[in-house]
């Protein structure tokens, strides 16, 4: 209802009396909650670690040893509880998670999302290739991997029935290098049988892209599609080396891209051409933090990096080349477009009614206060609402996020925390 409507004052009084009206403090603004399309949940424990080494070395020296520890449910509980709390505090109301190969720990992540009020999409990871995975961290057999995936789907769908904001099981082959053909085929069949979401990595780096070409004689996207893993509910992370045919295939199958600009800068070997994917090929794209290949849990940080990376792609980075050949024309995106990816784009990628403050969409919001003494966003008299909006996108910190709501329920309250601490 609009303030100038005849019934406005009456409706307002009724809502206040029913305690369904909350008046925001001055200099507060509502933004949709963020949708993070790519989070390696166990890797929260190593965020900010060894980002200066190649991907293959990073996985085998740091990541796989860490993820193997999630056989310990106590350790998993500690890490996952802290992660979900941190993501909510950073305005992330929906997250698409890679867990680990461990059934119990993966289920516990889903339960924590349900308990804390975050909309979580959780995948128990499959890594069954005996030759490509370390002996200490892999599925013992392909049959076991597929059976546990099916049981996980069934259990999380049952949990979802009693979870207001929703939790969702996700078919999750880690990436083609870690899986046998039998597993990839079986996972595609499970995705079709249960009509659930799918996630994996696709053409992430020179190493991964070339690995798939050598193994199958085709690009990652084409191989994944052959196994039934590109669908309307599929989200593929990175996609930095997609060719024209791959982009067309993503559009035709409805497959979305999780753009992870911070982690791509460390491990991606290239800048993903987001403007081309969205504007020329109509591929659905959202943002991902890619913890811990990306060091920050904040999509504010990632949307800024998305803009920076796109401008570097358009302008080029080799100063010895002439401007006309140095970069890629029309590759840049604006900060407004990056915000769209972090909200609406993520909702579209997941085929869920989230990411907008509109009728028919879930009430997922973050309340931003710009006038806090410890995190003040500067003002300029007479500036437009658009100017303030862009300042928030560039300058907001977790301290500015005072409240977070998911599906109409308050799940994070910085004001209450500050009052409790006497701040």
Segments from the language model and where they lie:
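Histidine-rich, glycine-flanked metal-binding segment
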Residues: 1-31
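Histidine-centered catalytic micro-motifs
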Residues: 32-44, 197-206
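Active-site gating loops and adjacent loop-to-helix segments of metal-dependent hydrolytic enzymes
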Residues: 45-76, 129-142, 206-231, 253-256, ...
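C-terminal cap of metal-dependent C-N hydrolases
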Residues: 362-421
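Metal-coordinating catalytic core of metallo-dependent amide/deamination hydrolases
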Residues: 104, 109-240
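Alpha-helical scaffold segments that flank or form the walls of functional sites
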Residues: 29, 47-118, 147-163
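His/Asp/Glu-enriched, well-ordered alpha-helical/loop segment
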Residues: 226-233, 274-377
